[in-house]
Amino acid sequence: MFNRTVRDRFEVIEPHIRDRRVLDVGCVDARPARQQSSSRIGHKPDMLFRRIVAVNPQTVGVDVDEEGVKALAAMGYSVICADAQTMDLGRRFDTIVAGEIIEHLENPGLFLRNAARHLDGGGTLIVSTPNPFYQGQTWKIWRYGRPEVHEDHTNWQDPTTLTALLRRCGFEIADGCWVQPRKSLFKTWKRLLRPYFSYAFVVVARWKGA
């Protein structure tokens, strides 16, 4: 596990969304508070939710961003405005995708347990999140004395902490890999210090409940 690196997290996601009941959590994507969701969505054709829907048109999206949800609904997407930590959608799914959302939440454990309640037994939860030890962050700390942190982030996860939290919440880990979307500026570091300096990582977990 975590012995391979992909360029695009969608390489991991796509096999788990074909011909399945899929929920995409955080479908609007994060945004700076000063930027309107509707404007940003209109200029972001490659957003994860759209890529998922292109593979599985029956996908349901959920997000707490009311403006963004309204914008997606106006485009014809099946979306719901709800808090992923406390939502009760009244239905279950085969796959839940949580792409770059867990680091925005006040209570990651509450979210994982609630995700489990929305999965059928043996269902799949896919979580991707930025890597706190990304080589670019190391450079920024060295150069500027601090890392670059999104204004809406509340926590950091690494593969060890996230897999431990998933297990505590009743999941078993099925797969994990690193995400490095562009060529590294620190090729020597990467060779010597392994992929732990990659940009992000993805964990695929199975719900063990009924």
Language-model regions, residue ranges each:
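A short acidic, Gly/Pro-enriched loop at the edge of an enzyme's catalytic core
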Residues: 85-96
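Conserved SAM-binding strand-loop segment of SAM-dependent methyltransferases
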Residues: 75-86
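Conserved SAM-binding motif I beta-strand of class I
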Residues: 58-63
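Conserved alpha-helix/loop element of class I SAM-dependent methyltransferases that forms part
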Residues: 3-20, 43-48
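Class I SAM-dependent methyltransferase core
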Residues: 24
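A short beta-strand submotif of the Rossmann-like class I SAM-dependent methyltransferase core
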Residues: 98-101
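S-adenosyl-L-methionine-dependent methyltransferase catalytic module, highlighting the catalytic core
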Residues: 4-7, 27, 31-35, 40, ...
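SAM cofactor-binding core of SAM-dependent methyltransferases
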Residues: 32-54
